[in-house]
Amino acid sequence: MTTGFLQKIFGSRNQRLVKQYQKTVTAINALEPQIEQLTDDQLRAKTGEFRQRVASGESLDKLLPEAFAVCREASKRVLKMRHFDVQLIGGMVLHYGKIGEMRTGEGKTLVATLPVYLNALSGRGVHVVTVNDYLAQRDAEWMARLYNFLGLSVGINLSQMDHGAKQEAYAADITYGTNNEFGFDYLRDNMVYETDARVQRALNFAVVDEVDSILIDEARTPLIISGQAEDHTDLYVRMNALPPLLERQIGEEKADGTGVERPGDYTLDEKGRQVFLTESGHEKAERLLAEWGLIGEGESLYAPQNITLMHHVYAALRAHTLFFKDQHYVVQNGEVVIVDEFTGRLMSGRRWSDGLHQAVEAKEHVKIQSENQTLASITFQNYFRMYAKLSGMTGTADTEAFEFNEIYGLETVVIPTNRPPKRIDKQDQIYKTAKERYDAVIRDIRDCYERGQPVLVGTTSIENSELLSHLLKQAGLPHEVLNAKQHAREAEIVAEAGRPKRVTIATNMAGRGTDIVLGGNAEKQASFIEKDETLSEEEKQRRIQKLHDEWQALHDQVKAAGGLHIIGTERHESRRIDNQLRGRAGRQGDPGSSRFYLSLEDPLLRIFAGDRVRAIMDRLKMPEGEAIEAGIVSRSIESAQRKVEARNFDVRKQLLEYDDVSNDQRKVIYQQRNELLEANDITETIGAMRQSVIGEIVHQFVPVGSIEEQWDVPELEEVLRNEWQLDLAIQEMINESNSISADEILEAVEAAADEAYEAKVELVGRESFSAFERSIMLQTLDRSWREHLAALDHLRQGIHLRGYAQKNPKQEYKREAFELFAAMLDAVKLEVTRVVMNVQIQSPEQLEQAAEQLEEQGGHLENVEFRHAEFAEAAAAAPVAAEAATAAMIGDAMSHGSSHTAAANLSADNVPKVGRNDPCPCGSGKKYKQCHGKIV
């Protein structure tokens, strides 16, 4: 109450910020008459002047009014577009490292030019991030005219570009590209063997378009570079026979033993999208696997030798019970292709990990491709947090403002529209069954069609879009379908969706980034006329004018009919996705309307709000075909969406906490790699490693502080001779000396090792040997890091079991991941020292040959797969709820400087005790007493 009262007096934080930026807008507008007087050359020269001032120490913030005024004037001259005042505010929001929410059609692409121009003046590079190659290329080509006019260079970073082209793109002042490609380039740069093979510069400033899609929807799963691992094809085929033999249990057993309606072998958690084997399910699976000869008679699935089988059992179960054809994937040309659950697009070339994709291939009886081993991985959360300054823009960010602030430290500012919006959002209509809902949708579409009003219908899956298409065909209503299967025609369909009588069915919001203009997209058709070389200039102008006149008539006709009408056939889990669909109507002050048609059979209503709404319908005695249209029901649905959003936020936050473990480790490894690549001589590093390894070996047989009788000298001599090529008569030294200490023996062995090393260096030369050492070091570090990623993956898959022992799984994961990391670094030291001490080389030529062979073994970028797994993978990658919270993630240990402290703080004594009514540590969301507390 007090907050509301204070807001009335002082305004909200958003209003205060906009008011503050309005003062700067006034200053920019005051400069306009003066800037307009400049010639093109004088305007272009301003860029050089600004760069000089930045180099002299002037801040970009101080330069902002002048730079924005220059950019606006250049845009007027080159693009024939003048930035509105609200667009200047948007530019400031982005420059100050915030997220700007701008309505559809408000010109986000043009807004970005202001902060991009200003920040490019520093010479440190600006990245403009889009969701696909088409938008990156379109925006770069469109805006390059403006930037080139102002003397700035523009690069486009696309997939499949060669190495030289990528280096050129990153060297430009401004680089356009996709989120995936920027992330993969970062990973690839940290897998190279030469400094000049890297493409990226330091990460300075990024403007992320459709920031909600990239930083939230896609943040739950990592970018992965992987190579082929061991082949288990036959096992997937055999495991595919298991799920049909198991029965689903209906109901969940309560503490008093009740709650199970029908006993079975596994349970499904639809909210968490997880599958669990029951006690009887474990027994049945073990019996069947024993019959098939996959495990020994009477053996448990949890026996150490059967752990990999457990992984295959759950992969097969998830494939059969949680993933369905034409909803989560399609089968095309004998391959299983993932469908993006957010956009409905086909994700060709991407594969689910953890064996899930192979299990789905076995289920669909298509060729099973080999499993992959992770070579490098990073999440968008951790990649984008590395930029010195990050900003973003979208049409729908306000509902996720808390998450942007919590995870990325980014404030969201809602930017006012240039013209007041005229879209009418009608009340939801809820029907008892899906059939009644679709009947109502067809009636609404027919009404719009007869009045000449264009309609965009949003569906949540390919299956639903094709069902609706079938119903429209039966009703005799012409329409276009825009889903993953029609990907190639996407831009064409979206561009024409605003024509009179046009009915377009779209899966989720495929086609984001392309405006739906009322009356159709005349500019697109005009561009075809412009490119037609058979026409004269006069004929081109005549045809374009005629086209514009026709478009204007259609535009007025559609406006008179009410503008674009949006129909939602289902509510999405997130209010933001619903708002994106609504936002396609009413652009730039045009009229428009939207309405959602729902049924009690929709997953969201069935799982979260169905009982409450059904009770209201029963109480009102609603006849068949009648809809309920009430604010209380819509609020109930919004409440359900908020619950799902909160749950998804918790999942993402928990994933980030796990990923923060491997992120710090990744930084340490990549920093060491970069130091190795940039160092002229690594003799000191190799020497320190040799000293450490030799010390450990000697102390193993001659412990510090021990007496001579406790020493195992013959064994030490044998190990040094056989494993380290050091032939030392240590026993003779002891016999000849009256008294000799363990430290003196260590010094003697170190001296012999140094002498053997120097002899090798002298033989082939310091420079050649140093290059060889660098190759060994990089190759060993990369191989050990890959194995470490796999070890972390296995660790997180079983870490939820620590909850049974009343230990905090997250803390246990951090502690053990740190121990694994320390062990990995020790293994690297040992392996590198072993190779250097054992290598037998007679000439520099032999040394070069050995280095080349090592680099060939490490040249894993030639036969690898680059993919960004979708959320379906993250949700499915773990057989239990806690695993869902860490799925498709590789964790993150302690920061380099404080690892000892962190490890000390992670002892089991510091793990909080779980109370009976506390949430279960496994992450299921249930109370401990109703989850793992029952078992304990």
Curated annotation (Swiss-Prot):
Keyword Heme set for record: no
Biological process according to GO: intracellular protein transmembrane transport; protein import; protein targeting; protein transport by the Sec complex
UniProt subcellular location: Cell inner membrane; Cytoplasm
Membrane topology classification: Peripheral membrane protein
Cofactors that this protein relies on: Zn(2+)
Segments traversing the membrane: none
Cellular component aspect of the GO annotation: cell envelope Sec protein transport complex; cytosol; plasma membrane
Keywords: ATP-binding, Cell inner membrane, Cell membrane, Cytoplasm, Membrane, Metal-binding, Nucleotide-binding, Protein transport, Translocase, Translocation, Transport, Zinc
Keyword Transport attached: yes
Residues annotated for ATP binding in this entry: Q87, G105, E106, G107, K108, T109, D515
Record family assignment: Belongs to the SecA family.
Function: Part of the Sec protein translocase complex. Interacts with the SecYEG preprotein conducting channel. Has a central role in coupling the hydrolysis of ATP to the transfer of proteins into and across the cell membrane, serving both as a receptor for the preprotein-SecB complex and as an ATP-driven molecular motor driving the stepwise translocation of polypeptide chains across the membrane.
Name of the protein this chain belongs to: Protein translocase subunit SecA
Originating species: Paraburkholderia phytofirmans (strain DSM 17436 / LMG 22146 / PsJN) (Burkholderia phytofirmans)
Gene: secA
